[in-house]
Every structure is written in structure tokens, then in C-alpha cells.
Amino acid sequence: MMNKRIFLSPPFVDRAERAEVDSAFDSGYVAPCGPKVDQFEFELAKLSGRKYAVAVSSATAALELVFAHLKVDKTWIAIVPTLTFIATVSPACRLGAEPWFVDCDSTGNVDLKLLDKALADAAKTGRKILFVAVDLFGRCCNYDTIEKLCRKYKAKFVCDSAEAVGATFNGRPAGSTGLAAVYSFNGNKLITTSGGGAILTDDKKLADHVKKLSQQSREKALWYEHKEIAYNFRMSNLLAAVGLAQLSKMDKILKAKKSVREFYGRCAEGKHLELLPKVEGENNWLTIMLLRNSRERDSLIKFFEAENVETRPVWKPMHLQKVFKGCRVYGGKVSENLFSRGVCLASGAGLTEADFKRIAKVLDDFAAERK
């Protein structure tokens, strides 16, 4: 009989979520908007150190709303780290922007020297510039330097902190940088609302506009009056209830995720296995192991799959995706190397001692065959 599936990063839920959802049902607010959404937004603003938070249906939706507010179109250049999930760049592309990709450094986050070069080249074109930073795998990029570079080249700076809820950079919370930042509450993230996202900002005009855009941009009138084309992206009151329960246990989840990384560190010792270098303040959303080459990467994934343990390669760089063939890229070799060698390991906050033993045995067996 097959062992139970150990998932990559499943939600960490218990009765607290059900109690919050029951409370939302009892209130009669089951549609988008409602007191749970208001409360969730208040807590998110506090968590991120921002003045405003707007809860929406996904981080992808959150980015598109921000870009729509900025009026991103085909006259814009969107500079994006190449090592990321496609949702970082796809909203800007849908609005018509031309994507330029920038390689990462050894941590997986954007290479600052290459970013400087890309921004300088974009500035020479005279076009409007958008830079979308990424806090990759729950590790914040260098907020201070990126803020300076974007000011220098007059680029609009938005931060994709989808993977980094609870992380920090030099004591600053993830999501505290840029004109706006976004969080993800997808089912695999550090905290979840089943599906959802949020926009974090200190700009009241932006916050008010994206909230309006997320609700079909309905005007304040007795009838349905609209002055712009918009979206239906607002978060449900029920999902916000789940989010509130998740926030209440975030410290526990962060502690568990840190323990998972430490476990893998112990497993790697003496086996010539390597983890992606630790970054101060990371939330340890996923632990990444680096193998010698793509053959070993695929072999380790197969070893785990044979024992019903979910793992997967790190993000395939955007400049290698067929949909972006021919797009400008600065560097690329570092992200290509991480993609060819990196495996995202099972990193759930609810892993049991039995789960850890199963995972450790797989790594032992892999290391023994690898020699």
C-alpha cells in the first residue's frame, strides 16, 4: 500500500479556520466585501508596515490592478527578474508592456549590477519604465538598493512579495517597499485564503483606485454607473475569514518552516548535498536543494516521487520560456544554473516525525546511489 502523499507546501489549517468561516456565515456576509475583508486588510496593512491594504482574488490580479492604475501599455518597458513565476510579468504583458528580463545572483534574487544596466538602457529609450522586483522563495530582495536605482532612472517600482509573507529585509517587512507590493494567499503559500492576494501601499489614491477597479469601477450612484473598464477581483468575505485564522498562527508557521530548513541542513551534511544559501530574514517558504546537474536534479525528484513525496524544479527562467522567445535578457547563466540544479523540497509546516523519517530515508538512499 502506497504511503500517504507528502505535498510540497500544503496549507496549515485546523479548527480555527472553520470557526472564522462559521462566523462569516453567521454574519450574513458571504459575498465579496464584508467585515472579515475589512479586518483582514487592517491586519495586512499592519503586517506589511503600509498604510493601506486591498484584498483581492489573487496576487496576479493584484499586480494587474496596480499596473492598470499606472496605465501601463505598449509604450512601457517592464523589467522583471527572469527567475520567477510567470505571474510576475504576465499582467504587464497583457496590458501591452515589452518585457525585459534580468538575471539573478547566487541567492536567486535579482542581480543588482545587471538591474542597473537594464534600467540605464531603458532610460535611454525615453519610454516609461516599470520594474517589478521579486522576493523569491520567501527571501527579500535588496529593497534599499532597488529603491535608489528606481529613483535614479525614474522607474515605477512594484514589488512581487507573493512568496514572502512574514519575511523581512533589514528589519523591514516584506511588502514594505515600492509604490505598491503584493502578497499571495494561494493554497501553497505560507498563509492561505484558499486563493487570494493583496495590494499593499502607502498611496491613498492608488489604494482607492485599485479597490474601485477590483469591483467593476462602479460609481457612487443609485444605478450602475461606470466610467472605465475594470475587473471583478475583490476578495470574498469567507476567504478573508480563512486568512484571519491563518494570520493568528503565522508565528507558529514561520517557526515550523525554519525547523524544516534546519532538518534539511542536517540531512545534507556529509552527503555532498547543498542547500540554496540562507538569506537573513527569509520566511523559509520552500527549502531548495542544489544538485550537481539536471540529471541529478531529475533523479532526486524521481526518488522522492517513488515514495509519494512531492518535489519540483525551481522556476524555469522566463527568458527560456517559449512565450518570451526573443525578448531582451541581461545575463541568464546564473538563473539557468539554478534551474538545472535546484529542487524545491517538501516544506510543509505540518510535517510529522514520520514524514521527516520518510524524507530522510529518501535522501540517504539517493546519496548512497549517487556515490
For each of these PLM feature ranges, what is it?
Residues 1-30, 346:
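N-terminal "arm"/small-domain region of PLP-dependent enzymes with the aminotransferase-like
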Residues 30-77, 91-95, 101, 172:
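Phosphate-binding glycine-rich loop
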Residues 35-42, 50-54, 113, 121, ...:
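PLP-dependent aminotransferase class I/II
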Residues 64-121, 303:
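Conserved PLP-anchoring active-site segment centered on the Schiff-base-forming lysine
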Residues 90-92, 149, 238:
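Hydrophobic/aromatic ligand-binding patch that stacks against planar heteroaromatic rings
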Residues 95, 152-153, 307:
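Helix C-cap/helix->beta junction micro-motif
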Residues 107-193, 198-200, 205:
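Active-site phosphate-binding strand-loop segment of PLP-dependent enzymes
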